[in-house]
Amino acid sequence: MADEFESLFKISATGTDLNGHTGTADLLINATSASLSSEVPIDNTDVISAKTICYDLAYASEPTSFLQWAAENGAAGSIDGRGMLIEQAAVSFNTWTGLQPDTAPVIDWIATI
């Protein structure tokens, strides 16, 4: 993904262990299953700044352990995987029916439950 965006702005990406990483990240994506067992896949709080957005592919009715960790360590914001789930469902619906559903009301509604 970094290769696709490098012509637009400075970007670097890593899929490695961030526990020894120095410097802060603009975006941290948790694509592990750690949140499903209430674990946090990283201990290094030095990667978070007041500009860091944290995204967890997992979703739950309450913030995941990763998103709680992000908030506790000063991240600018956090997003869970519910929006991704809804958008993937919309693509599937469109593939099968040819109709494009309006996902905004669903995203708004699911945020309330």
Annotate each PLM feature.
Residues L8-S78:
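Rossmann-like adenosine-cofactor binding region
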Residues M1-F9:
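NAD(P)-binding Rossmann-fold cofactor-contacting core
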